[in-house]
Amino acid sequence: MANVIKLRKGLDINLKGKAAEELSTVKEPGFYALVPDDFPGVTPKVVVKEQEYVMAGGPLFIDKNHPEVKFVSPVSGVVTSVERGARRKVLNIVVEAAAEQDYEEFGKKDVSKLDGEAVKAALLEA
């Protein structure tokens, strides 16, 4: 069981000195992985295949118990591997990032004209 620390009012840590005011640039990683174990209570069902192109915002896997909940790709690119462990448990889904990012379009909706169910459906779609 993981130790979960809950902060209610925050914590101020008094440190001497001041942080250096410098910015550094980092190279974008070429591979991104989505790990279903990072989401407690989720039983993943993979909806993409290896070597399939996905757009940023496109679903990689869904929750078997709640199929309306989708877990999407952070970048567009090719799914390089779907790693499985014992008893075919999904360990991670690796996406190789494309040079140009393509994003899934969900359209614009006027929230003031939608009812509660339509807003919920739009949020679950995205």
Q: Residue spans of the language-model regions?
A:
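Short hydrophobic beta/alpha edge segments that flank linear recognition/processing sites
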Residues: 54-68, 91-99
